Amino acid sequence: MQDWRAALEEYYSRYLDSALVLAIVNDSDDSNTAREILEALSIESQCDSHEEHWDNLRRDEQELLNLKTLDEEINKIDEEDFTWELKDSSLELDPDVYNFLRSMFSDLSAARVQLVQAKCQNDLVRSSDELLNHRAIQESEQIETAADALITSNIGHRSRQRKKKTKKATNSRKPLSKFQSNTEEVNEDPILKPSLSVWENNRLLIEKLTSILNIPSSQINHEFYKNSSAWPITIRNLIHRHQPLSNITNNELMKYQEEATQLAKDTGLSLKICTDVLICSNDYKNALWILCLIKETQHNEMGNIKLSSQTAKSNSSTQTKTCLNDQSSKLVEDDEALSAEDCNRLAEEYLELRNMQYSNSAKEYRRSKSNHLFGGSAMYHAQLGREYHEKALKYRSLAMRSLAHSGTSHSLDLHGATVREAKTIVRERVAAWWAKEADTSPNSIRPFVIVTGRGNHSIGLEARLLPAIVRLLQQDHWRFDAEHGQITVYGINRHSKLNSNA
């Protein structure tokens, strides 16, 4: 029952989404019903693609016409020349760059533009960034000044009453360590803001971790919800798979020991997790922020969680997914040394992994309707499914290549090949065989034997390879005999070739 489903999936996946084809094939009881549905959908998708193509062409032509019209209007406008302001300037400035900056930032003074351009050594991009920052600072200062004016005008009489002096607690004169001073800065801005919802807090934390660790937010989303929304375990797993940890040398590791020791002493976390966080963040303050997040969420959400090498086991479904992913990572690296059977087996395993990831993506997408954070997890699973699909195609291609080089110079076994693959292989092998035998006498030619099988593994137990190869050899004007799942090629059928030319 699986053979016709696999054949339909392989054929219609070229025109439709593979997940949709898989769902229709699995829901159908017989091949005819599934084929009718898929054929109708494929025809409809092809018609839609053609209409969409023509719509895109019309839209592109209209946009091009609009751009041409806009360019003509812009070219008619005379640009103002500011280069006369450089006559009395002692700075060596590029007139073209200055003219562009002056026209773009007309609200700024000429002296300010000249100083910024000289500071940036006539670099247009750097100068533009500097002037944009200056404009933003000016606007923020104006907003703060207006706000202060409103607040000052509303101050009451009681605010000017004399306050009693209170003695401040005398602090010890012991100098603050680097960690203590940075801890105060982190504590001023709480990691989990009580005024925000849980969803907003998690979104802000994911954005912060993305900027620090340079990890895609979809991957952090997936890891966070895979570990039951526990930040300590999530951060540990992300740090464990982070790229810099695998490239660190012993000399570089020694540089982080002093700061990591201080972090471990003051946070109470293990030296290993402090060192790993410091290496991955590559900044003391960022590492401190991540460790404070671990400490705070460990206390508030998870209790006394210890970040050790042995974490709590996930549920049985998570274990199954992990085992399959580990199995895919341990697949044979030497692709060229694999046989056709091994390549087909690996292709089937990758297809199973692809289907599992597409199923997980669909589940996460349905969950994202109630919680938007699951949208990133759905995208992550869909990306994994596409990667597994590409690997399955790769090993399928390797299987065809291995099959093409199998057998002897005068024989070929096509078991395990599809009709399309078999046609390509037969043409190559028969041409190579005839290149060697063409110069010999007709009585000395050694025939070429092609084994196609009797169709015992085909849908409906009907042979597919044999009729397809027979039609191919007839079209290419070969002389052959076909019987009992085997084709024997003797040479070129010259009479058939002459008749076709006539």
UniProtKB/Swiss-Prot annotation:
The record lists the membrane-crossing segments as: none
Compositionally biased residues, Basic residues: 157-171
Q: Where in the cell is it found?
A: Nucleus, Nucleolus
Q: What is this protein called?
A: Smr domain-containing protein C1235.03
Keywords carried by this UniProt record: Nucleus
Q: What InterPro entries does the record tag this protein with?
A: Endo/PolyKinase_Domain-Protein, Smr_dom, Smr_dom_sf
Has keyword Nucleus?
yes
> What are the boundaries of the region Disordered?
150-184
Q: Would you tell me the Gene Ontology cellular component terms?
A: cytoplasm; nucleolus; nucleus
